[in-house]
Amino acid sequence: MKYQPALQSATLLKRYKRFLADLQLSDGSEFTAHCANTGKMTGCAEPGFNAFYSTSTNSKRKYPQSLELTQNSLSQLICVNTAVANKVVAEAINANLISELSNYEQLQSEVKYGNENSRIDFLLTSDERPNCYVEVKSVTLLSQDNPHSGQGYFPDAPTLRGQKHIRELIEMVEQGHRAVLLFAVLHQGINQVSAAAHIDNKYAQLLNEAINQGVEVLAYKADISTNEIILKEKLPFI
């Protein structure tokens, strides 16, 4: 996914009210940007971090700028716009960059499925293969105890919605389909992914149950720059 035009730089002053972030330009001027992230953003939005933002051409937007990337104290870029995860995954699937999800004939998004009124991120279909249901999760939580370890976690906060998605994936396997939970790693410092049992033990237990029942878990890391993001490196899920 290319940023067109390339992102502009600023300094993050604070992130607040979930959807807002105050930024400061090099000339000292300040403005408020939209922050498309409902999570805690632990370790991703500290005051003083370098920040990179896009500007919308939609004149009706109250906040034309959007916070896209931050850069932590270890100079690692982090994509904090959660909408990007699905975009880069779709591009990677279409470009056959994810071998486990390659060679399907059709890719659909936001398809209703399951018994809990969910929508799957992606449904892959082919005439001679089982349907493949793909749920995407954005991973940006780096271990705070040992940030040099490369250990990433999901979720960064307790998530009933995430638990529901796992139950739905288990149901798809029981119906004879493929079900894949794909962790899109959008943090340069993360080199492996685990379920965050210390944050949401129920989620970790459900995920372990899902794996035992045949749900596939993949983790792919994005190559991040202020010009583009490409999902291409497979990481271990442990």
Swiss-Prot record:
CDD domains: SfsA-like_bacterial. One of its GO terms (molecular function) is DNA binding. InterPro entries: SfsA, SfsA_C, SfsA_N. Pfam families: SfsA, SfsA_N. Gene3D superfamilies: 2.40.50.580, 3.40.1350.60. It comes from the Bacteria. Belongs to the SfsA family. This is Sugar fermentation stimulation protein homolog. It comes from Pseudoalteromonas translucida (strain TAC 125).
